[in-house]
Design a protein with these regions (language model features):
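A short, sequence-level motif marking secondary-structure junctions
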Residues: 44-46, 81-84, 125-127
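N-terminal prepro-regions of secreted/extracellular proteins
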Residues: 1-42
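Exposed aromatic-hydrophobic patches
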Residues: 86-101
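Short, exposed beta-strand-loop hairpins at the edges of beta-sheets
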Residues: 55-57, 99-126
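Ordered hydrophobic segments in well-structured contexts
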Residues: 50-53, 64-66, 76, 88, ...
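Short, surface-exposed binding/anchoring microloops in extracellular/periplasmic proteins
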Residues: 25-72
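Solvent-exposed serine/threonine-rich low-complexity stretches and specific carbohydrate-binding patches
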Residues: 73-89
Length: 127
């Protein structure tokens, strides 16, 4: 009996140390700065359309939005922060379907770059 318990504990320990196939490298799909100056998201709307959005009080001008696909290909588009509601919240929202290729199922990474450096966090989503 004692030997069976020891073997069971040993097997559980070994299984616990092995990486699980169900665990994947997930990036967050939204982020807001601690100061509240900006928020980013890579979510879907109610029509299941992918929305890549960056909203900010602080950022203006052009921004480069890059999506890295599961195939390791990267597509970048230049977009502009716009204040469409005249409320001093500037938004960039490039259209996923028309601006970025669908590279099939898997993890996608989204990065916003401005003035030569990354702006905000790396976000992600899965298809």
């Amino acid at each position: 009996m004692k030997r069976a318990v020891i073997l069971s504990l040993g097997a559980a320990l070994i299984v616990g140390l092995l990486p699980s196939g169900a665990v994947a490298d997930h990036r967050p799909n939204s982020f807001c700065s601690q100061t509240g100056d900006f928020c980013q998201s890579t979510t879907r709307n109610s029509n299941r359309v992918r929305i890549l959005q960056f909203r900010s009080f602080a950022h203006r001008g052009k921004v480069n939005v890059c999506v890295e696909a599961p195939t390791d290909t990267r597509t970048c588009v230049m977009d502009r922060f716009r204040d469409g509601n005249d409320d001093s919240v500037f938004v960039t929202r490039p259209k996923w379907k028309t601006e970025f290729p669908n590279e099939g199922p898997g993890a996608y990474t989204v990065v916003w770059r401005q003035n030569g450096g990354r702006t905000g966090k790396r976000l992600g989503f899965h298809r």
